Regions:
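Subset of Sec-pathway N-terminal targeting signals
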Residues: 1-77, 83-85
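Hydrophobic (often cysteine-bearing) scaffold residues that line and stabilize catalytic clefts
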Residues: 41, 45, 116-117, 129
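Short polybasic/polar patches that bind polyanions
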Residues: 55, 124, 139
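Electropositive nucleic-acid engagement tracts
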Residues: 60-73, 129-161
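Basic, short loop/linker segments at the boundary and entry of helix-turn-helix/winged-helix-like folds
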Residues: 70-126, 145-147, 151-155
Length: 161
């Protein structure tokens, strides 16, 4: 990742944080069960799951390309996930009509986030290309993911920043 891109991404995060007024907020309002950090974490995972669904279906939400495609979005199901610090977060997991969507960031029937998902974001932040990340995940974890999925995941995270 170039220094210019790192600066731009840092600026986006700083702009987002500048919009928040932390003055007078209690610890519970920031880090508690329904606190700001938990809400941001939930939104972060939901963005990634929606990017995964876009990749799975081959089109973005509300895109006409999905008309008569044989499979489409079919709402959401609520899921409680256990985070790295053993706290929990509620997230909305997208569903498809054919029930063929297999999320990678939080797999079906799993309540914990796999390590490699944190690795995608970490490797991307260190400047690795989508293809490099794809190759690394395959070699180290035995996980096959498309470069397009990695691209969608990182784009979704940046949009939410």
């Amino acid at each position: 990742m170039t220094a210019k891109r790192q600066k731009k991404e840092k600026d986006v995060i700083d702009l987002m944080l500048d919009q928040l007024d932390f003055h007078g907020m209690t610890k519970d309002e920031l880090t508690g069960k329904d606190g700001l950090l938990r809400q941001l974490t939930s939104r972060f995972y939901e963005r990634i799951l929606n990017a995964e669904m876009d990749e799975h279906l081959g089109y973005k939400k509300h895109d006409n390309a999905g008309d008569h495609s044989g499979n489409s979005r079919n709402g959401y199901s609520e899921k409680t996930v256990i985070l790295d610090d053993n706290s929990t977060a509620e997230i909305a997991v997208p569903r498809d009509r054919n029930s063929t969507f297999e999320p990678l960031i939080i797999p079906k029937h799993e309540k914990r986030t796999p390590l490699f998902n944190d690795q995608i974001i970490s490797m991307y932040s260190y400047g690795m290309s989508c293809r490099d990340i794809q190759r690394h995940l395959q070699e180290v974890y035995g996980v096959t993911v498309s470069a397009d999925l990695i691209s969608h995941v990182t784009e979704a995270v940046m949009l939410d920043a």
